Amino acid sequence: MAEKSIVQEAKDIQLAMELISLGARLQMLESETQLSRGRLIKLYKELRGSPPPKGMLPFSTDWFMTWEQNIHSSMFYNAYSFLIKNGQCSGVKAVIKSYRLYLEQCAPQSDSPLLALTRAWTLVRFVDSGMLQLSSCNCCKGMFIYPRLHQPKNSFVCSLCQPPSRAVKRLKLSQNLADIIPRLLDEQVKHAV
């Protein structure tokens, strides 16, 4: 029976703690560390105060193709790709660093970001397996996540250059709200004076 290294176990615990703090699911923890499932559950409960969520990991590439999710996924993956190509880091450390960069750029509007860490990790695995790839937009030349061999060459247009109509409607609603609030505040100031 091989004896486990105490140093390696400490590194795995530290990595698991960092992943849990970023919202990793149990399956990701099991895949990226050598800790037992029981120890990971115990660690998760200790850090989060509740057991890890149950259920399967996302296994479809469809989620990454909807317009808003695609923009967020592409931002994350471009950061990840940059870190890998420039030798900054590799493996799960590259996922963590690029996810932190993503969080800095896309501050969540609610309690949780649109792109969760486990989904970002799954995206990396989808690209590595050839199910998804980065494709260049014909208009802006930005690199976006797209299914491999799905689009004819040189015909891809990203959802920033050609947003779907529901995205434009949502943008108009939010702009109207931003226009309305200052007027309401001005009226409140006039009534107070």
Curated annotation (Swiss-Prot):
Cofactor binding note: Binds 1 zinc ion per subunit.
Keyword Zinc: yes
Pfam families recorded: FlhC (PF05280)
Example GO molecular function: zinc ion binding
Domain of life from the UniProt record: Bacteria
GO biological process, one term: regulation of bacterial-type flagellum assembly
Subcellular location: Cytoplasm
Cofactor requirements of the protein: Zn(2+)
Keyword check for Signal: no
Principal location listed in the UniProt entry: cytoplasm
Keywords on record: Activator, Bacterial flagellum biogenesis, Cytoplasm, DNA-binding, Metal-binding, Transcription, Transcription regulation, Zinc
GO annotations of cellular component type: cytoplasm
Family: Belongs to the FlhC family.
Identification of the protein by name: Flagellar transcriptional regulator FlhC
Organism: Pectobacterium carotovorum (Erwinia carotovora)
Biological classification of the source: Bacteria, Pseudomonadati, Pseudomonadota, Gammaproteobacteria, Enterobacterales
